[in-house]
């Protein structure tokens, strides 16, 4: 069977190749004919083509003259034969490769050069060979094998899509060109073949578009179809739009192609099985004890049937014909005569995501089958749309499980999220708003699809049985208590079994989300989504307040400044509360602002501001980036000073854009022009003030997210209290429900604040509006009174902006069903600077007002309310709510009635056990992650596919690390990462005649380096195939966990094979890779580096040491590919791109913009920055240019140059630069800084298993307090004891609340300096300075422009950073996303590392402790699986110690040596 499949795959490859050659030949003849025609029509002097075209023609003619099609086909057949042999070799060693990727089989150089390389290149130029892998007949575990007939039946609707098109469901209105209430908003399960056939037939015959069996179709769908009434051109518009959507939106790769992604899955295998990953789940959950391969997953088996049906992937995503071809999102060719559904690519994405979910144990075999069946069910109509429609019904049923559980274990916390105790809680029932809610949910189970129903019913019954089981255990313990105290084993069993109940509820909650989320971005047309997303939804009207004071403009118009809120009862109470609680604070803060214009420029970023400038005087390059906000302002800043020009900018078009999301519908964004944003400044500044003030920020959650478990602090703490009610409500379409008067409410209140400012204050002018006497009108009930008052410019500016705010039209550019149109809507514009501020402050104010009214009644104070608000997301904890359900209902009734009066709708979700806020959920005090919300294979814009191979893999591995933190089997990400890397580590470089000398040099250079890099040079296509060393991702800075290595001992005549165990999945990023890798390559002739006795006897060796690199066997290190991999990763592509674009734009253009923008810098801070720069330079500290305050605007402009994706021409140029970078590679690094890093990391690792270095007194280290909680019930699903993370957690704690406090400080500083301020780089630089001299931290803050009032807070941020990170000469990086539930405190881990040499006086070495702590933590994280709770010992070399002692110099002096040695011990050497 497999032989026949390979032969068929080979035939398909050959057939496709011949078609490509014929197509190229036709193009060449066409070009030649056009050139001849051009030559005949022009005289000789003008007939010479442009050099690039001339070169292209010359190459093509030479290409066609030298090599015939037959020769190329013959050569290609040889290549295919070689690939068939590769496939045989891969199949023979497939299991060995999988075991290698999970660290149980040793990696050898032979495996790298043969089978691993075959896996990397087998599909190159032969993608149809994927059929051989899909149809392979390797043995599978019987328990994982599915019934093929069942799969084929499930796939039938997808593989046979409809040819009967329901045009009317798009709701196209031929008058206004909009889709009115469309029933189809996403790609449907229609045949793309037939869509294209219909389009073609229309253009060729100009006849009516054929619609088959309309009469029968109408009978199937009773109330539809008036096809006869729809104009033919509208049908054509719909079909062309769908074809464009299929081309541009259906494929959403993050990397590679479907073929290479599927091949990656072929090599994947679990490191821990379901039985280990589900160790805390009860036995009612099926747990396989077998390690599952990628080919044994449910979704692989579905995917394989699709591939077998079409004999490959039935479509081809074209690439641009450029170097390292990038995907072209304009054309997807169908390569089969069989029907292909528009939904097929989305289904394949969903199946690939399902494979990853099953390997990470997010899905078991049972739930993966439900997932696959649900995917097929949705795709029968529309993958995207049906998933969104089914979503709620698939996720509500776990509440019935909560209601049935009876007993569960809860974690109780202190206010700072320190776990205090485990408590077995009796849960009689869930909290229901009323009986109707429960009955409605119970009855909804009948509507769940048949493939889901048994699972749900069993889950509810299992919960009841588990509750009864715990109840019996409690009864047994109570009986024991009658005669004696229960022993610790009996009580421990109760906690353990109760913990399984909690774990079961968590698993069910996660499962309900995962099986209904395919991990794909729901992509659609802007036109189809417009009405659903942003068209205003109006159920009630909110009255317009009458003006109290108005400005009389020069044109005689009245512009309201102050309003009378008493006539608008629904807002009057909130207005009064604003005045009493917030107003005075805001007035005081605004009085201290020196210049609002400067603050506005601070908030301008390099993000798009809408339409690009069409100014004819601008260069092409500058026009290309003129839509960036900071650039746009720099170009037309003078127009802001002239009122007439500014008002023209106010009524300019905004632009609609669309963002795609996983598990949520597409979201239309209105890109608001800079001019309107200038008035948003005041609300944004006010918001920053209120969220930073502890008196007001109790409800405001913005700026407090730091990327670890503390982001769910409120949910973790409250869910452990089963007597409180958690309301995880959802505000339905808040943007669309925000009426104009609600949009204006807070902005009008901010004008009232500005009105109160002292007119003679520091900041009088704001662009065109200046400080002067203005003619105003006071509106009374029966008369108006004119008066004159001096006002600050910002007051006038804001008032005039609000007056024109809703006169702005929006430009809707769809590019699928229409080219573009202007639409006018009163909807809330989601692109405002202050969008988040608007919703957060409005809801906070609304809730505060309601609380005051509610608690004015004393009886209501039996409950207490805690709120967290961010944007349109609200989390509410009703303390004691379970005890007083009537008070809860009364409160919710008051709250919802108030919301309905202002046009808002809320979906209330109440629970005793569960809470979710900002997609962070918790149940009974443990975290409930949503792993499906992060997709490994899919990307919103597929931007990563356009990146260089090495940049791509960095991003992919970061996503994988973050995603797997939310899974049950975190450790299984190792195999996934290596499988993806191995199948995507090649690049094909197409070169021109101009590059031939470069390629020749590259090939010659590679030949001298054991042919590590170049694997194929094609004489037919002027192409070279490059392969990156397999071990590259193990090197710094990627530092993916090392595998199990085996190689011959250096300088050993007996050829002893040394093995090095695989390192833990918890390994840190950064320079720790140097420590780990070099353990294999220390040379025997440099043992004196580690044997200090020898060194003391022969101190003359210090002379040789200062230039020596002999401590490593560089030749051996090179042959593995480590040194080359490190060299390739040092290529700074972004820096080269920036320089290239700066060169294109011209230094003059940049300097003019910088000069214009620097006028808005604070002159005092500029001087302080320059003075501090000099101070730091005297201390041999260099401030990064981009961080200098005086360069902030320059940095923004340069960032604008790099925001847009590389063009194909730029990519070709950068790739040539990259290849030149390769030439600088040498086996022994020439860069002295690189050698210094190696020398600094010249430390031998000694573990307890190394008996020579184990101390007899070395016992087990004490476990952390938090670990006792985690062992019984893991805080995260994957932190169980079968996981490296669970083992690591035994010696650390949860993230500290101190980190959370710091996150608010970080938000405060960014709020003051603008969103584009690189706070992370600023903190890292501060940490670097702090580690050198903590007294210089103020100078560092001033140099980078931190205002004086934030300096102390900046120092707090720096100190928090150095608790978890180290960046002085050696970089040890702790990413919160990768260690979501762990503290990485360097001080905490310092106790796990010992010094192996007692001869050295480590206490005398400056900064030794800091370096030692960083080295220790890196080694503990890497070796956690083999330390077994004992210390790791560090055997420092002379190189390492002397580099730690020095400020970076490698000139070692004998005087340094006397500091190193313990004089008492030295006497023994004489």
From Swiss-Prot:
- Signal peptide segment: none
Where are the residues of the annotated region Disordered?
Answer: 28-55
Top-level EC class: transferase
Example GO molecular function term? hydrolase activity
Reactions mediated catalytically: RNA(n) + a ribonucleoside 5'-triphosphate = RNA(n+1) + diphosphate
Hydrolase found in the keyword field: yes
Could you tell me where the Polar residues compositional bias lies?
37-50
What EC number(s) does the entry state?
2.7.7.48
Q: State the superkingdom.
A: Viruses
Which keywords annotate this record? Answer: Hydrolase, Nucleotidyltransferase, RNA-directed RNA polymerase, Transferase, Viral RNA replication
Is Heme a UniProt keyword of this protein?
no
The free-text function statement in the UniProt record for this protein reads:
RNA-directed RNA polymerase that is involved in transcription and genome replication. Following infection, it catalyzes the synthesis of fully conservative plus strands. After core assembly, which consists in recruitment of one capped plus-strand for each genomic segments and polymerase complexes, the polymerase switches mode and catalyzes the synthesis of complementary minus-strands.
What protein name does the entry list?
RNA-directed RNA polymerase VP1
Organism, by scientific name, is Fiji disease virus (isolate Sugarcane)
